A protein has these predicted regions:
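Generic protein-terminus/edge-of-domain signal
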Residues: 1-92
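N-terminal regulatory/effector-sensing and dimerization cores
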Residues: 59-157, 193, 198
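Short, solvent-exposed loop/helix junctions and linker helices
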Residues: 79, 173-176, 228-229
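Extracellular carbohydrate recognition
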Residues: 168-171, 198-202
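Basic, amphipathic alpha-helical hairpins
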Residues: 185-197, 209-222, 233
């Protein structure tokens, strides 16, 4: 399909990533994402592994990697070894977690712990950005976050100390423009190849976490595996 459409190349030139992404409409930024090159790995027909490893998705020498979540995918409950953050920028998506279904709507953000069996489905032209963060380097990359006394820090500390229970945190941001700007800039930095892009992504993640706690700490919804249910602060 890509070859017939003239979209498959042996080599690609670096895209121009110098625009003013903060003030674009969702449709304008979606076109920018459409123009970003993708590196494809040929599928050999073997069954998909039930657990996605960090190295399967996050490029070498990166601690943070951002993609626009694929649309119209087949259901595939899976686990992975990294933290996944899904932000619904436009529309909605179906979040399946431990046999439960949730519809995430525009402005909602969900942090999924490693080793949690889940799936995320987009069945229309909605836009969801997925932030992948290495678990293996999290405690050093986000050291300042680990020393704070809030539920977000507790969530990460508990997991990094060896708790492998399925878990998630959810924020309801009312589609805050500041959060969206941070994630857009993370997405663009993930597409850059210079020596500064990883550090920039880390900085935007820290800004995003701080903004979430500053404005939306009272909206946190936490999957409590001991209770088997959600509760809100």
């Amino acid at each position: 399909y890509l070859y017939n459409k003239g979209l498959l190349y042996d080599s690609i030139s670096a895209p121009d990533l110098t625009g003013d992404y903060d003030n674009m409409t969702d449709a304008e930024f979606d076109k920018i994402v459409d123009s970003l090159p993708l590196t494809l790995t040929l599928y050999n027909g073997a069954p998909l592994a039930p657990t996605v490893e960090e190295a399967d998705l996050i490029p070498n020498a990166r601690d943070v990697f951002v993609i626009r979540h694929p649309r119209y995918t087949r259901p595939n409950l899976h686990r992975h070894t990294y933290f996944e953050i899904n932000f619904v920028a436009n529309g909605q998506g179906k979040f399946i977690f431990e046999q439960e279904e949730h519809i995430l709507k525009e402005g909602e953000l969900c942090i999924i712990a490693p080793n949690s069996k889940h799936d995320f489905l987009i069945e229309d032209d909605s836009t969801v950005f997925t932030i992948c963060i290495r678990k293996s380097t999290f405690d050093t990359t986000f050291f300042s976050l680990m020393t704070r006394k809030d539920l977000l820090s507790y969530f990460f500390r508990t997991i990094l100390q060896g708790d492998n229970h399925a878990n998630y945190l959810m924020f309801f941001t009312n589609n805050n423009s500041v959060i969206k700007k941070y994630i857009r800039n993370m997405m663009i930095e993930s597409s850059k190849k210079d020596m500064y892009s990883n550090a920039c992504c880390i900085s935007y993640v820290n800004l995003m976490f701080s903004a979430l706690l500053r404005s939306y700490s009272q909206t946190i919804q936490f999957y409590n595996y001991e209770m088997g249910a959600d509760f809100s602060l």
